[in-house]
Amino acid sequence: MGAYKYMQELWRKKQSDVMRFLLRVRCWQYRQLSSLHRAPRPTRPDKARRLGYKAKQGYVIYRIRVRRGGRKRPVPKGATYGKPVHHGVNQIKFARSLQSVAEERAGRHCGGLRVLNSYWVGEDSTYKFFEVILIDTFHKAIRRNPDTQWITKAVHKHREMRGLTSAGKKSRGLGKGHKFHLTIGGSRRAAWKRRNTLQLHRYR
């Protein structure tokens, strides 16, 4: 096995004495830093490489701290108006994962960079910590490489805002196989609309 395989096995056993100590110390360290800061290198190089990171110019790592827990509906004095079924304020669950929220915040902060992917690095009772891989699309090392030219195209601007990253696609219900029939046609809304629209074809 190569070195990265050993690192992968270490991270799989998070309850081991070594990892429990490491994660605890790192969480303390991350709490002292600002909620969004640049990391000098990936904490998990094996995971970062699997997600597309390369230790070369043009690649940047940002570490994000996201507060855990559900979402409270932002309404003044709890006045939601409308029917009682929609009166909920406190026990609202956000549709997207905290990882996709972290990607969005990194993308907003670094508007000139493109979000490639992200991964979990730790959590405690209050926060979750993620590292986001960003790419500088104007760097020659990125533009001249056939493997990374795709992300330099304008259609990939703020892909994290539109649910095009791996974490963003999870909450959209996209995938292959019989478990993902609700999103045939691109989205849940498209699938629902097609099934609930009466189409009377001319020849039948």
Curated annotation (Swiss-Prot):
Q: Which InterPro entries does UniProt cross-reference here?
A: Rbsml_eL15_core_dom_sf, Ribosomal_eL15, Ribosomal_eL15_CS, Ribosomal_uL23/eL15/eS24_sf
Q: Which terms does the record give in the GO molecular function aspect?
A: RNA binding; structural constituent of ribosome
Indicate where this protein is primarily found.
cytoplasm
Q: Where in the cell is it found?
A: Cytoplasm
Lineage: superkingdom: Eukaryota
Which SUPFAM superfamilies does the record associate with it? Ribosomal proteins S24e, L23 and L15e
Q: Could you provide one GO biological process annotation from this protein's UniProt record?
A: cytoplasmic translation
Q: Which UniProt keywords apply?
A: Cytoplasm, Ribonucleoprotein, Ribosomal protein
UniProt GO cellular component terms: cytosolic large ribosomal subunit
Assembly and oligomerization: Component of the large ribosomal subunit.
Free-text function comment from the UniProt entry: Component of the large ribosomal subunit. The ribosome is a large ribonucleoprotein complex responsible for the synthesis of proteins in the cell.
The family note in this entry says: Belongs to the eukaryotic ribosomal protein eL15 family.
Q: Which PANTHER family match?
A: LARGE RIBOSOMAL SUBUNIT PROTEIN EL15, RIBOSOMAL PROTEIN L15
What is this protein called in UniProt? Large ribosomal subunit protein eL15
Q: Which organism is it from?
A: Ctenopharyngodon idella
